[in-house]
Design a protein with these regions (language model features):
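Feature of Fe-S/electron-transfer and energy-metabolism proteins
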Residues: 1-233
């Protein structure tokens, strides 16, 4: 998949949203190293085989680890208009019962249900799954998660890491998109300066200053718009 122009960016974003919140149930299996070590690959295969065999209108996706490795394999089940349900310690023998419940719009087997997520702040975007199931705890009410604020790992366990469209759907690359749309180098440099982003080589020189010096420098490459500055950590 290539994004060859700015207009295509919005199209890709809509395509990603349609995957995260499709008009049919979505089941996501955590197949990070911890999940795979506890049999998640077998669970994913069982879901795939059973969905195909029954001809079910269910979207299946592999995702990473949500963070509760001791409870793997974790499986997220979402039915349109309802909270996302996080299931734990799911094994292949649970798959039929889960799919039966999803097909009927019922709650999955009680022994597999850990908590619910009604909405999620990806920081770069906000997703509302749905509301309901008052008897279930919210994810942040689970003792292990209580007090946690997910920042760097906020997307783990919810997005398919191999699908860039899903990342774009929740605001991924939005800063780059804004820069390309606005096409105002001076404003971009001022924003970087205001953020006080700096190098880590020892001198701690401000990145915004480096970019400003580069932009002001004379040279044929700059005037052709081919100059590029990289701030590596």
């Amino acid at each position: 998949m290539k994004i060859q122009d700015i207009a295509a960016f919005a199209t890709v974003r809509e395509a990603g949203l349609a995957k995260l919140l499709p008009g049919k149930p979505r089941i996501a299996v955590g197949v990070g190293t911890c999940g795979s070590g506890n049999g998640a690959e077998s669970v994913l295969h069982a879901f795939s085989s059973e969905i195909d065999a029954r001809g079910l209108a269910v979207q299946l996706a592999p995702v990473g680890c949500f963070g509760f490795c001791a409870e793997e394999p974790l499986v997220n089940v979402w039915v349109p208009g309802r909270p996302l349900l996080m299931l734990h310690r799911v094994q292949a023998n649970h798959v039929n019962g889960i799919l039966n419940a999803v097909s009927l719009g019922d709650m999955p087997p009680a022994e597999t249900v850990l908590c619910k997520i009604e909405e999620w702040d990806h920081l770069t975007g906000h997703v509302k799954y749905g509301y309901g199931y008052p008897e279930l705890p919210h994810w942040h009410e689970v003792p292990f998660f209580k007090g946690q604020v997910k920042i760097v790992l906020r997307n783990c366990g919810l997005l398919n890491p191999d699908d860039i469209e899903e990342y774009i759907a929740i605001g991924g690359y939005q800063a780059l998109y804004k820069v390309l749309i606005d096409a105002n180098p001076a404003a971009v440099i001022e924003q970087v300066k205001a953020a006080k982003l700096r190098g880590r080589g020892g001198a701690g020189y401000l990145t915004g200053n480096k970019w400003e010096f580069l932009r002001a420098a004379a040279g044929p490459e700059k005037e052709k718009g081919k100059a590029f500055a990289e701030q590596a950590a």
